[in-house]
């Protein structure tokens, strides 16, 4: 199990999230909200809602929690695989990958066959022909992997999806089959919304969970 960052920063259960991910994940990468909460990067350019949530999170986490967040790696590369929270071109800049042109830049920068990212909260899979360089967005929830392609995968978001589907999103990589599959898991959104409101966090953060955008 791998977590590509932003464990904290929007929700009302930051400490339990850190504990759960810490217990279960083999790899945890740093997201920009994690590092903002830990005081590693400034958050003055974040939107007002995000700033308020970060300030609240800083108050409720322990110094040990913040130390853990501050020491998370930005990127992990293993053989054909590159994992990062945002663009791998300069991970500390947390650049967004929103268009095929951005994906092409990523493939020109890295040598790996697979690149897995998060950051935009929008699940997407793009494959690029090794021979021609042609890219296409794959719409199926599960695809079989082929040697002739390179793959860019945005894994979406567990805690705040933004693709009009409020269910938690994750990706299953099966190296034996081999395949990549997007999984959606329902959870108690109302309970999460109630916690956010009870803690005095911006109501938009609660509303957004159901709006999923």
Task: State the predicted function of each range.
Residues 9-11, 33-38, 89-91, 116-128, ...:
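Active-site environment of divalent metal-dependent phosphoester hydrolases
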Residues 1-66:
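Core catalytic region of metal-dependent phosphoesterases/phosphodiesterases
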Residues 130-213:
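Acidic, His/Gly-rich catalytic cores of divalent-metal-dependent hydrolytic chemistry
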